[in-house]
Amino acid sequence: MSENRLIYLPLGGAGEIGMNAYVYGYGRAEIERLIVVDLGVTFPDMDGSPGVDLILPDVSWLIERRDRVDAIFITHAHEDHVGALALLWEKLGAPVYARSFTANIARRKMLEKEQPENVVNTVSIWPETVSAGPFDVSFVPISHSIPESSALLIASPAGRIVHSGDFKLDKTPIVGEAFDPCLLYTSDAADDLLC
């Protein structure tokens, strides 16, 4: 008997700075529908990796399941969250969703690598929702050091998760919007928080 399950798989960025790439999946084991949050790079330690310019997350697990990847969501435009998108998109082939500032950066990166820019979709903040397989994803403004940074409210049949992305607690940020915690205290509040 097969049961549906919710999975979370960090491919980079967990326990390290840079190379953010996370997978959420829902469904029966081995046939879950998948979404990706961020596709970033990291920069090498010049003492230990001379001649290496960028390090990408290992997405071989995702490539093997490419037909199950429903969407890629980018939380903000820092290189460690969007820097690998144009380098890896062709291997995954899923539509990309981001807020306006981040989407424009992502489109530019796609053009530079001769990838189709029209796969990058601009979305508005919550309550707008993007449906991707069994997931409904909303972008929630959060303070950070770059415009239009977002946490993601990810709803699945198993519950709701907040994927925070990078953030700083700042009620009056110089760049971007302040986080409104009231957004998480609605009837659609999250069951889990992943930072």
Predicted features, each with a name:
Residues 2-73, 78-187:
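His/Asp/Glu-rich metal-coordinating catalytic cores
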Residues 185-195:
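Single conserved hydrophobic/aromatic residue that forms the stacking wall/gate
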